[in-house]
């Protein structure tokens, strides 16, 4: 007999089954909006690797998504048929870059870490504006190349990219859950719960946080790659600080460390806010009230008494077990 699926696995299967059904039957012009929500959801999931596992508040998701987008577009301009090589190279480079900058930023301490990651997004924007001859500057850059996959050819269309976004999200959720249940994941949670106790037990906090930050940066870069080739046009405003702040907001609403709730929060709340166009100028107030209510609901949920999972001491002990 096959082992019974856990509750989390059943919830994940139901969530992605519902999204797949939506993608099959929703009209193309509706999918255009949904795909923008999925792009934001991928960045929320990327931030969850940093904050939900490593306890690192990051405002670099917009910059990392922009790095992935511009790197892929510029590389495809020279190698238009090499998507199979270009996309993995961009993602791996983003992982290496994020993991590398995490090390020195870790030494700044918790209070300055968010400010340091904010600098990544600001530096990205300044570099794009300065190198206008290559990046198009503030005017943006038209994306003439398309993603090409062997046997499928050039990928285009709202529905095709919907399922690409969905597939990347499913892989990201699986990676997050697998890492969380692994020994490095338990060590990361121990560092998050009690950094001093984890360090005193010999856990390399900086190396583990480099891993979580690198994975978050790589996922944001991949989201940027899909966003660039789907929309056909990129400019710095698409990857501004607003994207990083929205990712942080929705992650706080859904709960850092939970893999599905932040994604549901993005899709539900963004859909509701998109449907408030009829309110005219009052929609800004309505958006604020809706997000405030969602934040209060998230706070109420997190403050309810509940059975606590094993504490940091147990996680540290499990993380120290020999491989």
Range-by-range predicted roles:
Residues 1-18, 142, 191-208, 272-323:
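Cytosolic-side transmembrane-helix boundaries in multi-pass membrane proteins
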Residues 1-42, 71, 80-86, 157-159, ...:
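Membrane-interfacial amphipathic/re-entrant helices at transmembrane-helix boundaries
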Residues 23-77, 103-113, 190, 195-199, ...:
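Single transmembrane alpha-helix segments in multi-pass membrane proteins
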Residues 40, 66-70, 91-95, 119-123, ...:
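Residue-level recognition of pore/gate-forming positions within transmembrane alpha-helices
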Residues 62, 87, 209-296, 307:
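Transmembrane alpha-helical segments in multi-pass inner-membrane proteins
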Residues 79-122, 264-266:
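Alpha-helical transmembrane segments within multi-pass membrane transporters and channels
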Residues 155-235:
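Helix-loop-helix "hairpin" substructures at the membrane interface of multi-pass membrane proteins
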